[in-house]
Amino acid sequence: MEYITMQEAWDQIEAIPGYARKKSSLLKVREFLGLLGEPNREFQVIHVAGTNGKGSVCAFLTSMIREAKIPCGTFVSPHLVDIRERFLINGEIVPEPEFIRAFLEVQHACEIWERRGEPHPTYFEFLFYMGLCIFRNAGVRVLVLETGMGGTYDVTNVVENPLVSVITSISIDHTAFLGSTIPEIAAHKAGIIKSRRPVVYDDSSSEAAAVIFAKAKEMKSEGFPVTPDEVRRGIRPCLVKSPDPVDPGVAGHQEMSFSYRGEEILFEIPFAAPYQLMNAALAVRALEVSGLPVAPEQAAEGVKKAKWPARMEEISTGVYLDGAHNADGIRAFLDAACRLKELRKPDHVRILFAVSADKDHQRMLREIAERLKPDLWILSKMESHRTLSVEDLEAAAEKLRAKYGEETEYRVSRDVKHAVKELLGLH
């Protein structure tokens, strides 16, 4: 058998182009999966699409299913540190030997594929194929599957009979691929709805909900909207104490009463961000609709134990990490951050900000400055070819300084690792 190290496999994957001149059709995707023995037919699937909240919904679902001891695989993106984070088996990162085994399986299929004159799969396609092999090899029964981008033409949409489709919050993002309006983007997301298969969706946006409702009707699928009012009615006033003995008064958790299998269940949400209430509600409703044998107490315990890094994650006392990447994500981050600022009343608010060049960074910076009012900004490059340049970061710092005054300090860093050390050194 061929031998390859984890690092060698990872390096080869990272060398795969992220986009192809021509996107693989789902027909071609199914043809490629045939070379792998059609692993896509091995699981019961919960398919999750949306702009924001997909990963959190997947995390809640995974934790609840795991609590019921149902063998569960989870495919999510992107990874933060280790590429294996994209593939979870019963909530745990796939072991290196299983990662390498799947890599070699897909690599072998690619060699056959290219000999036929077909183009090599894109980065995301390759990882999706790997995920299906990983989960098949692990004997997974239920797959929680997050889309990459959009829905209709996403490689994950080869799923034919999901237990339930879930569509989270929809906002403006990836406009070059999905369109520039909410209805256009919602139409792409709604593409995961399958004939006569139920769909659970966030009803916060009337524009998006109308598109999803129409698509569900077209597909003869039953729709299960979760409304903001339904979530708000369930919120319970609480100040759940943090496990941190030095600062025990932090509202690190939230409580929400929500219907599950005909019972009103009190769910403890282990995240400070208000938007996680809707994400938890979507996951609970989707689990109920899926018909999976998860008891109410298992669902409640699963939500309580859910983990999802970089979503207002407190990595050290008073230090939060958040992966907001678009306008709605920034607003959700600010809702949570301002809430915590009000509760904790810190002496200083310092922020490290890094962003991709294709994002509306000026708008993001303006909203953060006006609402959170940081004392110190560190604007940094990321370790990515998509990062905003140092020159653009410096220009952004100058604009902030001109508008919000000299009393706020601005720094620009060429190295995000150095920037993190600098920030933590001040804490």
Q: Which ranges hold each PLM region?
A:
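Short, surface-exposed connector motifs at secondary-structure boundaries
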Residues: G191-V199, L340-V349, K373-L376, K403-E406, ...
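Acidic, Mg2+-coordinating active-site environments of NTP-dependent enzymes
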Residues: E114-R115, G139-E146, P162-F267, A280-E297
